[in-house]
Design a protein with these regions (language model features):
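Catalytic cores of nucleotide-sugar-dependent glycosyltransferases that transfer UDP/GDP/TDP-activated
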Residues: 1-152
Length: 152
């Protein structure tokens, strides 16, 4: 039997429902956040969408930058050309959260979709409904994850 247990230096989880209750995924995320914080010594960061232009944040979001995000928020986030708000999720375990505003990516949508088609064969012209919103949030979340992983 293999006793391997991965111990990542940082665990990142992204979802449309981080600090944005829409359905059942929110319940799944909040119900296990405390246990994940314990198991990973607080080295987990949740990434969700920033859906407001004002300082009117979700009621379950604490707008105080957690220690694990202070340096990244100060040094790296400003260079990414996206608006970020760092804080904690008001749920058991109070996990750190990065909310990312993906709206600026709409200006680059055609280029981003072309790159997805060219590299991965994704036919974005077949998307409908909230395709753009979900896709652009996914790209913004991936950029955020990359930055967090590359940050010293």
């Amino acid at each position: 039997m293999n006793d391997f247990r991965p111990n990542p230096s940082l665990l990142l989880e992204t979802s449309w429902e981080v600090c944005n209750k829409q359905g059942g995924i929110y319940t799944v995320l909040t119900s296990r956040a405390h246990e994940m914080m314990k198991r990973h010594d607080g080295r987990i960061i949740f990434i969700g969408p920033l859906l407001t232009e004002q300082e009117d944040f979700p009621t379950d979001f604490e707008n105080t930058v957690p220690a694990i995000l202070e340096d990244w928020h100060r040094d790296a986030a400003p260079s990414l050309d996206l608006r970020y708000v760092c804080g904690s999720w008001r749920t058991p375990g109070s996990p750190p959260v990065v909310l990312v505003d993906f709206e600026p990516l709409y200006a680059q949508k055609a280029t981003l979709y072309y790159e997805m088609w060219e590299h991965f064969g994704i036919q974005s012209d077949k998307g409908y409904g909230d395709y753009d919103e979900a896709s652009l949030f996914g790209i913004a979340a991936a950029q955020t994850m990359h930055s967090l992983c590359e940050y010293p």
